[in-house]
Amino acid sequence: RDVIDWQNEIRQHTKSSGESYSPDYLKNVHTQLSCIFNHAIKYYGLQINPAAKAGNMGSEQSKEMLFWTKEEYLKFIDAMMAKPMLYYAFEILYWCGIREGELLALTPADFDFEKKTLRINKSYQRLQGKDVITTPKTKKSNRVIQMPDFLCDEMQDYFKQLYGLEPDSRIFPLSKYALKRGMEFGCKASGVKVIRIHDLRHSHVSLLINMGYSAVAIGNRVGHESVEITYRYAHLFPTVQKEMADKLNVERSN
């Protein structure tokens, strides 16, 4: 009952401008409260999660997962050739499947071109007008990604264009808004459908699924638990489902 009263009260609050809070914001606040109760259940003996029992508030509609095929991405990136920094940023996003904040926190020290690896151990945020580097989203997000040869070559070329670069300097001193505008420019110039920056991550996962990699292997690369990959992208595993059905046919026949 207390949680429901809290929900009703917060719905009545407004911003300093007089506007009501958006459904997405309300849902995010409720989710954070629910996480606190889940923590109390796990570590402090709380019996139930009252936030979960009360139900969510705000938007219940999750944003549709969109992704590009490899052919669509190649059309898009070809249109970005005239904007080098954005070009290389999108190359990393698509071929490595990292998060936007992880991309914007990258430094030269994160690249090992001899081993052809990229280390992910931090994230970038803009808070109260300041650039802030934080720890990654989850413990699983700390990872080392193997880069394909062509991407190693591209990034070494890019580093040569960055004069006076220090080991701890951000190699993409961009804002999230600049990335979004770059995406809009590339989509318009190439004629491919508009997707969100985060959908490049979905596109990377989709590509790996189509290449035949397991949920465990993909999860390790993108910083997700394999169960999350299976849950989020189950509809993209049609060949696996067909293989299961074929093997069940064999088992039944035997």
Regions found by a protein language model. Name each.
Residues 1-47, 62, 84, 173-177, ...:
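N-terminal core-binding DNA-recognition domain of tyrosine site-specific recombinases/integrases
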Residues 42, 91, 95, 101-102, ...:
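C-terminal catalytic core of tyrosine-transesterase DNA break-rejoin enzymes
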Residues 71-74, 123-126, 148-193:
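Active-site/catalytic core of tyrosine-dependent DNA strand-transfer enzymes
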Residues 56, 105-157:
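Conserved tyrosine-mediated DNA breakage-rejoining catalytic core shared by Y-recombinases
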Residues 67, 124, 152, 177, ...:
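Catalytic-site neighborhood detector that most strongly recognizes the C-terminal catalytic loop/helix
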Residues 75-79, 129-135, 235-254:
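DNA/chromatin major-groove-contacting recognition/catalytic segments
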Residues 30-34, 104, 148, 152, ...:
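Hydrophobic face of alpha-helices
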Residues 19-23, 27, 42, 46-106, ...:
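Basic, Lys/Arg- and aromatic-enriched nucleic-acid-binding interface segment
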